[in-house]
Amino acid sequence: MPDVVNVGFVPMATSARGVLFVFCDDALKFGPDTVKALGTAANAVKRAAATSQFKGKSGSTLDILAPEGLKAVRLVVIGAGKLAAIKDHDFLKLGGVLAGKIGGGKEAVTVIAELPTGAMTPAQGAAVAAGVRMRAYKFDRYKTKKKDGEDTPLNASVAIAVRDVAAAKKAFAPQNHVVDGVIMARELVNEPPNVLFPVEFARRASQLRKLGVGVEVLDVPAMKRLKMGALLGVSQGSTQPGRTVIMRWNGGKKGEQPVAFVGKGVCFDTGGISIKPSGSMEDMKGDMGGAACVVGLMHALAARKAKINVVGAIGLVENMPDGNAQRPGDIVTSMSGQTIEIINTDAEGRLVLADVLWYVAKKHKPKFMVDLATLTGAILVALGTEYAGLFSNNDQLSERLTEAGQATGERVWRLPMGPEYDKMMDSQFADMKNAGARHGGSITAAQFLQRFVDDTPWAHLDIAGTAMGAPKTDINQSWGSGYGVRLLDRLVADYYESK
């Protein structure tokens, strides 16, 4: 994983040189330590704010070069907006805004982590630091030449001045590991498909062993013995063999029931024989965003030594249209024994998940399962790119996911499920079809998956709109977002981890 910015904490009284960042509210007020640090430069801030109509709105910035009265060569004021409305994840965004204003220079960066109400808490200062790292991430390793004006990599040392350095470091340590997990997920989603095919993906997931994660890789013969006919049917059209990877972190009590996360990992999706249009097909390298999230999450949980037992499982395939490819009209038998008529070979992700969900439910018997998948285009029609679709057979799990989404800014929206939708998958020749009618596509996909979880509490997150190609934000300028890592880490930490 690239590490392009170094973030640390220093005492509040540290003298600022290079670039100085400070925060104000929507009344252009500063905290006492900030006022002291600015000294007579506060007058320059007032003049510049009036000239540029800077109002301190959340995320807005005021940039002043060589401010009189400061040793800093540059002063950047970041608006925090109305303090009464600020939420925990807003500090992450403030860190992202900060990183976006550092620029390509090599000057030292000092940040006074203070609002008008006083110094930020250790957790808030840590969130600012995490936001800096998340915004700084960039995927450009395959560019050998840079165009004129193209952004240069951010290579800076950022010192965040806080009231209690030790407490800030302690608060940042687990957040830093979560950011590592987010960046790992982004890296996987951004990689080209000729580099990240199923075997290579499995190899990278296996590197989690260094953190104490148990990793088992099921190859094609092993999956055949397990009768994973749904997954193998998708994979059979590719020269790249499929894999299923089972990751196990045992941070909880010995023998305690684990929680489980399952990810769809279609490393490239042409649609198969039901081939996709050529426009934007290159984006289908990201059809493994769910699997990327699960690997990033397992990294985060293991690195911060989460006190919980966790199973992470990913099904890895390519969906290709060669002479051995699955056909519309084929009937496959899933690991559960249920038979599936293939109506559309481009409805392949649910086939991969069907076998992996069943495997995890029966072998590991988790407290709950959450699966993540870039499953349907229909979810973008319904929710756009701001929310992931949430489907579940368990109200408590849904409520907790929703609350974790609100806390992290990785939001979910629950959509309906019900037996009325099942008839849309009735098949004349098999137990079910793999695709329903045109309408309610995200719902029927979830109804399909529910048939493979038995009585296990389960939630399905359709992340087709949030995992890749979503609009750039204050904390992500990358095509791959790493969506879901922070959401699920927060779910585990708030509700299931031993205290």
Curated annotation (Swiss-Prot):
Species name: Rhodopseudomonas palustris (strain BisB18)
Tell me which cofactor or cofactors this protein depends on.
Mn(2+)
Enzyme Commission identifier(s):
3.4.11.1, 3.4.11.10
GO molecular function per UniProt = manganese ion binding; metalloaminopeptidase activity
Gene3D superfamilies recorded? Leucine Aminopeptidase, subunit E, domain 1, Zn peptidases
Q: Which domain of life is it from?
A: Bacteria
CDD domains tied to this protein? Peptidase_M17
Q: Which residues does Mn(2+) 1 bind?
A: D269, D346, E348
Active-site residues are K276, R350
The places in or outside the cell where this protein is found are: Cytoplasm
Q: Which UniProt keywords apply?
A: Aminopeptidase, Cytoplasm, Hydrolase, Manganese, Metal-binding, Protease
Catalytic reactions of this protein: Release of an N-terminal amino acid, Xaa-|-Yaa-, in which Xaa is preferably Leu, but may be other amino acids including Pro although not Arg or Lys, and Yaa may be Pro. Amino acid amides and methyl esters are also readily hydrolyzed, but rates on arylamides are exceedingly low; Release of an N-terminal amino acid, preferentially leucine, but not glutamic or aspartic acids
Pfam families per record:
Peptidase_M17, Peptidase_M17_N
Gene Ontology biological process terms in this record: proteolysis
The entry's free-text remark on the cofactor is: Binds 2 manganese ions per subunit.
**Residues involved in Mn(2+) 2 binding:** K264, D269, D287, E348
Is Cytoplasm among the key words of this record?
A: yes
One GO CC term of this entry? cytoplasm
Does this entry carry the keyword Manganese?
yes
Protein family according to the UniProt entry: Belongs to the peptidase M17 family.
Q: What is its main location?
A: cytoplasm
Protein name listed in UniProt? Probable cytosol aminopeptidase
Function in brief = Presumably involved in the processing and regular turnover of intracellular proteins. Catalyzes the removal of unsubstituted N-terminal amino acids from various peptides.
